Curated annotation (Swiss-Prot):
Gene3D superfamilies, A to Z: 3.90.20.20, Head domain of nucleotide exchange factor GrpE
Ranges annotated as biased composition (Polar residues): 1-20
Keyword Ubl conjugation in annotation: no
Keyword entries, A-Z: Chaperone, Cytoplasm, Stress response
GO cellular component terms listed in the entry, alphabetical order: cytoplasm
Full protein name: Protein GrpE
Transferase listed as a keyword: no
GO molecular function: adenyl-nucleotide exchange factor activity; protein homodimerization activity; protein-folding chaperone binding; unfolded protein binding
Species, as recorded: Ehrlichia chaffeensis (strain ATCC CRL-10679 / Arkansas)
Entries under Pfam families matching the protein: GrpE (PF01025)
Length: 203
């Protein structure tokens, strides 16, 4: 009986660790060893590569932004240029149309001026002609047409037409002494040159 009891008694089982299992956190035989320094360096290198990729992409985006900004500026500049050209064409057309009409009025201005010189000041007719003359000049000025009366100025062939010369030792050469016929400009364009007599020092 005792033998059976002995036979039925089981010897204690021990859970021995397998060759590749960790029992105390240490690397067991047969498991590849990892170098912590190498692992850290690899991680840093990987982050550097990712950073370089991000910087490269950022640089591309920056270049694209500069390109689009330049394109936008060119588009705005082109638009402004077209606008200026169109406005200039409108102004030139307007000036051309007014110029033809204004030239017809200049002869009326000249006739009124001549009449004023020949009429006695204070006469009722003189007053009426003077009022008409002033109204005509005001009408011209409202359309940016200005009278040129350059006595004492230096002769400028762009706006003046010399019809004669007079000796005047006290004046510099080409000083305007008399205005035979006044000129007119419309904005910055010549409508009619002023006919003038200019000075010279001697014959």
């Amino acid at each position: 009986m005792s033998d059976n009891g002995d036979n039925n008694t089981k010897s204690p089982q021990h859970n021995n660790p397998q060759p590749n299992e960790k029992s105390d956190g240490k690397v067991q035989p047969g498991q590849p060893q990892v170098n912590p320094q190498r692992k850290f360096t690899a991680g840093i290198n990987k982050k550097k590569e990712k950073l370089n990729e991000d910087l490269s992409e950022l640089d591309k985006l920056r270049q694209q932004l500069i390109h689009f900004q330049n394109q936008f500026r060119l588009a705005v500049a082109d638009k402004e240029n077209v606008k200026r050209i169109m406005q200039k064409n409108i102004d030139d057309t307007s000036i051309y149309a007014i110029s033809n009409f204004a030239r017809d009025l200049l002869s009326s201005c000249d006739n009124l001026e001549t009449s004023l010189k020949n009429l006695k000041e204070g006469d009722s007719i003189h007053a009426g002609v003077l009022m008409t003359y002033k109204e005509l000049l005001n009408t011209l000025e409202r359309h940016n047409i200005t009278r040129i009366d350059p006595i004492g100025e230096k002769f400028n062939p762009q706006f003046h037409k010399a019809v004669s010369q007079m000796v005047d030792a006290e004046k510099d050469d080409n000083t305007i002494l008399h205005v035979v016929q006044p000129g007119y400009i419309i904005k910055d364009k010549l409508l009619r040159a002023a006919s003038v007599i200019i000075s010279k020092k001697s014959d």
